[in-house]
């Protein structure tokens, strides 16, 4: 990427993402302090739930959406070696998303949208929150369109050639996001906004939760696919080796996109509006989608072993010590995989019908998704930033040693934060509470774990500040010499000359997704329009 305008587009998206991230980190530390009860002066349910809602929206929607858009533009231009298709439209999408973010932030920060990032109805937020969230998503749809167009144009210009793996993964993510965002869009447009404007008096919460379930689990893969992309296209090269298999990587992204969509009812296991058969179907699908994660773990570790042995590693495990641990990308993937293993185990518990009943609505649940998202996913966002930031600003990274310290402290802080969070869930602490106003032997047993969480949160906050400082210094430092480093994508150990169309495109898989979505969500949604709901029609009018 040599065009200054395109680099500016990428950097603008990434800066919005990371500034939202660091604000959310400060809010997160306040929350563990407030909930612990150690500082009574901080206790305020109003401020707490405004903080939790803002923290969740900034992390789950703003950080991820802007990062994925910026990273996607970078991948598209550097892997396809073409400029962004319609850069004016790309900027339009950016400004629409930014406008939506600001619109949603005002009611969040003023306590008029304390509905958490899931905003389950019939709890209401100010209408500007819903309109802002809608604009954020609409701006991201512009990005999806640009990715799909660039993918199609490249295939048309290079018939029979394998699409670069990085672009294949990015396009899979754009396709997944277009499908999965439809659920929340329907909820907001036909239920939340009309209710907030007073156009309707009531809504069916069961339909609202079903529509949000359409989005709630696949959005995790929308967040995760950029991390997996780095696993496959950056890590092997940075480690000094080769990608174990290009074809396996493509299959993993296809399974994530296809089978990651028609699931989500494990979030509704305790809800009465869906029958147990549909929950079982979605539960089975949830276990199916764990397969690409297992495949990814195998492929990435195999690629690392190739690199370690090429660097002189001997014996069964000697290759591990031969890896370049001082490389931020390599260190990040090792730490990310460790957190993914533990977080994946928690995900299996959540997806299991019986075990889910034990931990449903307990502190276990936020412990789990912080380990998967803020752990595995975000640490790879750091790694990607450390790798591409010098390429974007044409200056060397300010401090590689600071980057390594930041990655280790993020891993340590996340471990200290989420381990007691899981334990508190097993001890029965409910989630979504601002404080504990009663003292029993059980609640007193929670105190040591809450103290540990405060300590872990402080480490994470310091780590986040180090990250932002390193990027800012990299960009603001004067250039002392010409920067010539170029992006390097990993090559497979067996070069790919040609691929079957089902591993090089999405026409077939888009049709499969349509069929699976109709099976998984058709009857569960349509039932609300045909069954008696006792005065609460599906859309509310």
Model-derived regions: residue spans:
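Fe-S ferredoxin-like electron-transfer domains
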Residues: 122-124, 128
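Hydrophobic cores of alpha-helical transmembrane segments in multi-pass integral membrane proteins
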Residues: 10-41, 46-82, 87-114, 128-151, ...
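Membrane-interfacial, low-structure loops and terminal tails that flank and connect transmembrane helices
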Residues: 1, 156-161, 307-325, 478-506
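Intrinsically disordered, low-complexity regulatory regions of eukaryotic signaling and scaffold proteins
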Residues: 65, 275-278
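Generic start-of-chain signal for non-secretory N-termini
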Residues: 1-12
């Amino acid at each position: 990427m040599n065009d200054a305008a395109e680099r500016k587009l990428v950097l603008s998206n990434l800066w919005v993402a990371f500034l939202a991230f660091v604000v959310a980190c400060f809010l997160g530390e306040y929350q563990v302090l407030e909930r612990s009860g150690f500082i009574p002066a901080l206790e305020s349910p109003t401020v707490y739930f405004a903080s939790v809602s803002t923290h969740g929206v900034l992390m789950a929607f703003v950080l991820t959406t802007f990062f994925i858009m910026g990273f996607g533009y970078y991948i598209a231009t550097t892997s396809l070696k073409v400029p962004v298709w319609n850069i004016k439209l790309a900027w339009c999408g950016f400004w629409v998303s930014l406008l939506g973010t600001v619109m949603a932030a005002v009611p969040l920060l003023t306590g008029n949208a304390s509905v958490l990032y899931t905003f389950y109805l019939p709890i209401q937020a100010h209408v500007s929150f819903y309109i802002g969230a809608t604009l954020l998503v609409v701006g991201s749809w512009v990005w999806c369109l640009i990715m799909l167009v660039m993918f199609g144009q490249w295939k048309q210009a290079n018939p029979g050639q394998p699409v670069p793996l990085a672009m294949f993964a990015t396009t899979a993510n754009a396709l997944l996001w277009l499908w999965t965002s439809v659920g929340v869009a329907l909820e907001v447009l036909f239920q939340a906004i009309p209710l907030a404007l007073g156009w309707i008096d009531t809504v069916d919460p069961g339909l609202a939760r079903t529509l949000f379930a359409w989005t709630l689990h696949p959005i995790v893969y929308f967040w995760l696919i950029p991390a997996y992309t780095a696993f496959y296209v950056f890590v092997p090269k940075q480690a000094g080796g080769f990608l174990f298999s290009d074809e396996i990587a493509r299959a993993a992204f296809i399974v994530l996109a296809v089978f990651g969509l028609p699931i989500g009812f494990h979030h509704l296991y305790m809800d009465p509006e869906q029958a147990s058969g549909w929950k079982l179907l979605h539960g089975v699908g949830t276990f199916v989608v764990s397969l690409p994660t297992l495949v990814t773990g195998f492929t990435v570790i195999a690629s690392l072993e190739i690199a370690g042995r090429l660097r002189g590693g001997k014996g069964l495990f000697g290759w591990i010590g031969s890896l370049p641990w001082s490389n931020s990308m390599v260190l990040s993937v090792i730490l990310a995989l460790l957190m993914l293993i533990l977080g994946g185990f928690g995900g299996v518990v959540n997806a299991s019908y019986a075990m889910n009943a034990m931990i449903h609505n307990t502190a276990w649940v936020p412990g789990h998704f912080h380990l998967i998202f803020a752990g595995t996913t975000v640490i790879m966002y750091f790694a990607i930033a450390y790798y591409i930031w010098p390429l974007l600003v044409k200056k060397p990274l300010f401090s590689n040693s600071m980057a390594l310290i930041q990655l280790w402290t993020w891993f340590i802080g996340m471990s200290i934060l989420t381990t007691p969070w899981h334990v508190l869930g097993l001890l029965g602490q409910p989630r979504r509470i601002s404080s504990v106003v009663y003292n029993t032997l059980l609640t007193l047993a929670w105190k040591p774990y809450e103290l540990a969480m405060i300590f872990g949160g402080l480490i994470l906050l310091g780590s986040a500040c180090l990250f932002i400082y390193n990027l800012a210094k990299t960009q603001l430092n004067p250039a002392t010499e010409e920067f010539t480093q170029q992006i390097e994508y990993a090559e497979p150990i067996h070069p790919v000359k040609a691929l079957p169309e089902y591993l090089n495109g999405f026409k077939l898989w888009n049709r499969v997704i349509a069929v699976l979505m109709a099976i998984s969500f058709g009857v569960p949604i349509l039932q609300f329009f045909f069954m008696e709901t006792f005065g609460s029609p599906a859309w509310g009018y």
